[in-house]
Curated annotation (Swiss-Prot):
It is an enzyme of class 7 (translocase). It holds the Pfam family ABC_tran. SMART domains: AAA (SM00382). This is Nod factor export ATP-binding protein I. The complex is composed of two ATP-binding proteins (NodI) and two transmembrane proteins (NodJ). Residues 6-236 form the ABC transporter domain. CDD domains: ABC_DR_subfamily_A. The gene is nodI. InterPro entries: AAA+_ATPase (IPR003593), ABC_transporter-like_ATP-bd (IPR003439), ABC_transporter-like_CS (IPR017871), ABC_transporter_ATP-binding (IPR050763), ABC_transptNodI (IPR005978), P-loop_NTPase (IPR027417). Part of the ABC transporter complex NodIJ involved in the export of the nodulation factors (Nod factors), the bacterial signal molecules that induce symbiosis and subsequent nodulation induction. Nod factors are LCO (lipo-chitin oligosaccharide), a modified beta-1,4-linked N-acetylglucosamine oligosaccharide. This subunit is responsible for energy coupling to the transport system. The lineage of its organism: Bacteria, Pseudomonadati, Pseudomonadota, Betaproteobacteria, Burkholderiales.
Length: 304
């Protein structure tokens, strides 16, 4: 593998008058899990399309597995596995047949395809479903099959768009466990996700983008420390604006989202004492997390 598995350098992309990606730069090291986070319309999908050579950038440089994109996208994609946001499995085939057919797309012989199926079924924990139709699988099983299919060519890099969207918590945790096993084997993962817990658990580093521009980058723990840096008390009740004014002298800063007041505190005791006098309020005291960072950077009303 080259020094960087993925390189984006000052990449721009517009559609008509709308700039979708605006000078975006990031790199992903071999063996790293790197997350792209951003609200809907931030440019994440366009970024992935350019990385795979499906869309050409208007400016900037892209390299995937050391290959210039889009000029040598076909060569690079031979070393890449892709997990799309929505499962595109063939419903007319069994679990085993979906893997066999996909292997032939990479020029593998019939014998090679047959040999790679058992370990992939074991990886996806689908051994007992090898001859089941796709329509017979649960959502979590379909997602694990899609992940196994992306590994048919033993790729160096996995590109995953919202890998656990629509899954229940148990299925989501199983996917996370499988992804951690891939990282332990030295695979490189680039993923987009709306689940902040997913990003915090899996990603070594993150890039937060909004309107096609990078607004923050770093390790999850470092971003939490730099952007939040203290505990959070969520308060649920009537008139959050009046409550904000009441508590302002006791907290570092506040944010309002709907009917919820977020108080950022270094010393929580004075706030707790005040809240205990208010039977009409419910509250939760917790450590800051990546969701606080994401919402602060991309869209919640901030009050200093």
């Amino acid at each position: 593998m080259p020094e960087a598995a993925i390189e984006f350098d000052k990449v721009k992309k517009s559609y008509g008058e709308k700039t979708v990606v605006d000078g975006l730069s990031f790199h992903v090291a071999p063996g790293e899990c790197f997350g792209l986070l951003g609200p809907n319309g931030a440019g994440k999908t366009t970024t992935l399309r350019m990385l795979l050579g499906i869309a050409a950038p208007d400016a900037g440089t892209i390299r995937l597995c050391g290959e210039p994109i889009p000029r040598r996208a076909r060569v690079a994609r031979a070393r890449v596995g892709v997990v799309p946001q929505f499962d595109n499995l063939d419903p007319d085939f069994t679990v085993r047949e979906n893997l066999l057919v996909f292997g032939r797309y990479f020029g593998m012989s019939a014998a090679q395809c047959r040999a790679m199926v058992p370990p992939l079924l074991e990886f996806a924990r689908l051994e007992s479903k090898a001859d089941a139709r796709v329509s017979e699988l649960s959502g979590g099983m379909k997602r694990r099959l899609t992940l196994a299919r992306a590994l048919v060519n033993d790729p160096d890099v996995l590109i995953m768009d919202e890998p656990t969207t629509g899954l229940d918590p148990q299925a989501r945790h199983l996917i996370w466990e499988r992804l951690r096993s891939l990282l332990a084997r030295g695979k490189t993962i680039l993923l987009t996700t709306h689940f902040m817990e997913e990003a915090e658990r899996l990603c070594h580093r993150l890039c937060v983008i909004e309107e096609g521009r990078k607004i923050a980058e770093g390790a999850p723990s470092a971003l939490i420390a730099s952007e939040i840096g203290c505990d959070v008390i969520e308060i649920f009740g009537p008139d959050p604006v009046a409550l904000r004014d009441e508590l302002a002298p006791l907290v570092e800063r506040t944010e309002i989202s709907g009917e919820t007041l977020f108080c950022y505190v270094i010393d929580a005791q004075p706030v707790h004492a005040r809240l205990k006098q208010r039977a009409d309020l419910r509250y939760l005291h917790r450590p800051a997390n990546l969701e606080d960072v994401f919402l602060r950077l991309t869209g919640r009303e901030m009050q200093d």
